C-alpha cells in the first residue's frame, strides 16, 4: 500500500477556528453569548462580528506571524478575540490583567506585539506599560463596556489609542474570507507562564494542538450539545483551557463574567441554567463558603485543576449540588490532559475515601498519548506502587511547540521524545497519577502561578537581606501562598521587619505574588554543597499550618 499517501483532500490543516463557522451554520439562531443585563448574541452574530474584526485587523496591516495581544477579563470581546485574531492570520497572546505595568511591558516587548486590545478598565495599566517600552509600541485598541458604570470610554480622552473595538466591528467586512493556516503546525496562540525580566517563558501552541485539546476536553468532560458555560475561569489562563473553541464546537452558551463574585454566580446559575464551569480550587472554596450557598435546583459540573481541593471543601461543594471533576495540566499542554476518571463503584465508598481518590490527578485523557513518571537519574519508569516518586513526563498532540526565543529552555523541556514537566509524582498500582510536588520554583496561589525565583530576586535587592528562599505555604482558601525565609546581614543597622519586607514587595510586583509570610532565620539550611535545601523549608512552611491574609 505504498501508493496510499496524504494528499490535499485528506490532510487539510486542523484548526479550532473553523468551529465558529460551523456553529454559525448549525446553531445560528442559538444564543452564543450572554453578558450583563442587555448583551445577548447568537452564533450567527458572533461569527459575523469576528469576521468584521479580523477584516479590520487585516486592513491595518496585521497578518501571518504577527502577535496580537489582549488585556481583558472575560467580556464578550475577549471571547470573540479568541477567534477574530487567528482569523486574521495573527498569533493570539492573552495577557493576565492582574500583572503590573512593568511585567506587561516586558511581555509586550518580548513577543514584539503589533497590536494590543485593552479593556476600558485596564487603560491606565496599558498606557503605563507601553510608556516603559524602548522598542516600537503596539497599536492600541480600547474595548468599551456598556454593561458597566464608567465602561464607555471617551476616545477624545484616550489620545494614545488608535481605535475602539466598536470601530473595528463597524468598518470590517462581514464577508471577509478568514485566513486559514498554511500548516496545522503554524503557531496560533502564545501564553506566558512567567514574566521575569531575564527570561519570560512564552509558550507557543499550534493550530493542530489546540484543535486536539479542544475536542479532547469535550470528550473527557462529556460535554453535551448546547451546554451553558459560565466563565469563572479567566480566559487569559491558558486560553480558558481551550473552552472558547470547545463551547463553539457544541453550540453552547457562554455566560461572560467580568470578575468573580459568589452571589452573582449563584444568580447566573439560576437565571441561565448554567451547566458547566471551571476554576482553581479557590473557586470551590468561595462558592461553598458564601452565605448564598444554598442547594442548587440542578446539577452544575465544575472542572478544577492544580492542587486538589481539601476534603472539607469538596464535600461541602458536592452537598450544594456541584459535580466536581479534578485534573492536571500545564500551560505547556494547553489544558487538562490528566483527569481523575471516576469509577461508579467508588460512589459507595465513605466520603473520606472518595475525597482521597479525587485528590489524585488521574489518568491521561483519551486524546493524549502517554504519561509516565521516571527516575531523574536513570530516566526509567518508576515502580507503580503509589510511593516511588519521580519526574512526570508526557507526550501528546497538545504539547507546546516550544518557548519563544528560548531554544535552551525548549531543548531542556522537550527531549528524548518527551515533555519533562519538572513536577514530581507517583503512579498508583491502578495506573492513576498523583502529584506530590509541583515544579520546585512554582507556587500556585488562587489559580495564579508565582515564580519563587522572581520573588527572591526582588527581595535580594533589599540591602539588609543576606539570603532568601521563597516556598509554598499551604492555605485552605488560596491553596498555597508565598512564604519567604530570610536571613539578614550581620551588623546591618535598621533591620527591616516582616511588614516592611512585604510592603517593599507590594511596590515591585503584583499583589498575588507578595509573600504572605516572612520568617527570619540566622542562616538558611543548606546541603553539603552549600545549596539551600528548599525541601527543608517546605516542610517548615507546611508545619506552620494554614494562614490567610487578604
UniProtKB/Swiss-Prot annotation:
Keywords: Fatty acid metabolism, Ligase, Lipid metabolism
Keyword Transferase: no
Matching Gene3D superfamilies: 3.30.300.30, N-terminal domain of ligase-like
Main enzyme class: ligase
Tissue: Expressed at low levels in roots, leaves, stems and developing seeds.
Family annotation (Pfam families): AMP-binding (PF00501), AMP-binding_C (PF13193)
The keyword Ligase is assigned to this record: yes
GO annotation terms (biological process): fatty acid metabolic process
Molecular-function GO term, any one: ligase activity
EC number, UniProt record: 6.2.1.-
Its biological purpose: May act as an acid--thiol ligase that activates carboxylic acids by forming acyl-CoAs.
PANTHER family associated with the record: ACYL-ACTIVATING ENZYME (PTHR43859), ACYL-ACTIVATING ENZYME 5, PEROXISOMAL-RELATED (PTHR43859:SF56)
Family: Belongs to the ATP-dependent AMP-binding enzyme family.
Protein name: Probable acyl-activating enzyme 6
Natural source organism: Arabidopsis thaliana
Lineage: Eukaryota, Viridiplantae, Streptophyta, Embryophyta, Tracheophyta
Gene symbol of the encoding locus: AAE6
Amino acid at each position: 500500500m505504498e501508493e496510499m499517501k496524504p494528499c490535499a483532500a485528506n490532510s487539510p490543516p486542523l484548526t479550532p477556528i473553523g468551529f465558529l463557522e460551523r456553529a454559525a451554520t448549525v446553531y445560528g439562531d442559538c444564543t452564543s453569548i450572554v453578558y450583563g443585563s442587555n448583551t445577548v448574541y447568537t452564533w450567527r452574530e458572533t461569527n459575523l462580528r469576528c469576521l468584521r474584526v479580523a477584516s479590520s485587523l487585516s486592513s491595518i496591516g496585521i497578518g501571518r506571524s504577527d502577535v496580537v495581544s489582549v488585556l481583558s477579563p472575560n467580556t464578550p470581546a475577549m471571547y470573540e478575540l479568541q477567534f477574530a485574531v487567528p482569523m486574521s492570520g495573527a498569533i493570539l497572546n492573552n495577557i493576565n490583567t492582574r500583572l503590573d505595568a512593568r511585567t506587561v511591558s516586558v511581555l509586550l516587548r518580548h513577543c514584539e506585539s503589533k497590536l494590543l486590545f485593552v479593556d476600558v478598565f485596564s487603560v491606565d495599566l496599558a498606557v503605563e506599560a507601553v510608556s516603559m517600552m524602548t522598542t516600537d509600541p503596539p497599536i492600541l485598541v480600547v474595548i468599551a463596556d456598556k454593561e458597566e458604570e464608567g465602561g464607555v470610554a471617551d476616545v477624545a480622552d484616550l489620545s494614545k489609542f488608535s481605535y475602539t473595538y466598536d470601530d473595528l466591528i463597524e468598518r470590517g467586512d462581514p464577508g471577509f474570507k478568514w485566513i486559514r493556516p498554511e500548516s496545522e503546525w503554524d503557531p496560533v496562540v502564545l501564553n506566558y507562564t512567567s514574566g521575569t525580566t531575564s527570561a519570560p517563558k512564552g509558550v507557543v501552541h499550534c493550530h493542530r494542538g489546540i484543535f486536539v485539546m479542544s475536542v479532547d476536553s469535550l470528550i473527557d468532560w462529556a460535554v453535551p450539545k448546547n451546554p451553558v458555560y459560565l466563565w469563572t475561569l479567566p480566559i487569559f489562563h491558558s486560553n480558558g483551557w481551550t473552552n472558547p473553541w470547545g463551547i463553539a464546537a457544541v453550540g453552547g452558551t457562554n455566560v461572560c463574567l467580568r470578575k468573580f463574585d459568589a452571589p452573582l454566580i449563584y444568580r447566573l446559575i439560576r437565571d441561565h441554567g448554567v451547566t458547566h464551569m471551571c476554576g482553581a480550587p479557590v473557586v470551590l472554596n468561595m462558592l461553598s463558603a458564601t452565605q448564598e450557598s444554598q442547594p442548587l435546583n440542578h446539577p452544575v459540573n465544575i472542572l478544577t485543576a492544580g492542587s486538589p481541593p481539601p476534603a472539607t471543601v469538596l464535600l461541602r461543594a458536592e452537598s450544594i449540588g456541584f459535580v466536581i471533576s479534578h485534573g492536571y495540566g500545564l500551560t505547556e499542554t494547553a489544558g487538562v490532559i490528566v483527569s481523575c476518571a471516576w469509577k461508579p463503584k467508588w460512589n459507595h465508598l465513605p466520603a473520606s475515601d472518595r475525597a482521597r481518590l479525587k485528590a489524585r490527578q488521574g489518568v491521561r485523557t483519551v486524546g493524549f498519548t502517554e504519561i509516565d513518571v521516571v527516575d531523574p537519574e536513570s530516566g526509567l519508569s518508576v515502580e507503580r506502587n503509589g510511593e516511588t516518586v519521580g519526574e512526570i513526563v508526557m507526550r501528546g498532540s497538545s504539547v507546546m511547540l516550544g518557548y519563544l526565543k528560548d531554544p535552551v529552555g525548549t531543548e531542556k523541556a522537550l527531549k528524548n521524545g518527551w515533555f519533562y514537566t519538572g513536577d514530581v509524582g507517583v503512579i498508583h498500582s491502578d495506573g492513576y497519577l498523583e502529584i506530590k510536588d509541583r515544579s520546585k520554583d512554582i507556587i500556585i496561589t488562587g489559580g495564579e502561578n508565582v515564580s519563587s525565583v522572581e520573588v527572591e530576586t526582588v527581595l535580594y535587592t533589599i540591602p539588609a537581606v543576606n539570603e532568601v528562599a521563597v516556598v509554598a505555604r499551604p492555605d485552605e482558601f488560596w491553596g498555597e501562598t508565598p512564604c519567604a525565609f530570610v536571613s539578614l546581614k550581620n551588623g546591618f543597622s535598621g533591620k527591616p521587619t516582616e511588614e516592611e519586607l512585604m510592603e517593599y514587595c507590594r511596590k515591585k510586583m503584583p499583589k498575588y505574588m507578595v509573600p504572605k509570610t516572612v520568617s527570619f532565620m540566622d542562616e538558611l539550611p543548606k546541603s553539603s554543597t552549600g545549596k539551600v535545601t528548599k525541601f527543608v523549608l517546605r516542610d517548615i512552611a507546611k508545619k506552620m499550618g494554614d494562614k490567610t491574609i487578604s
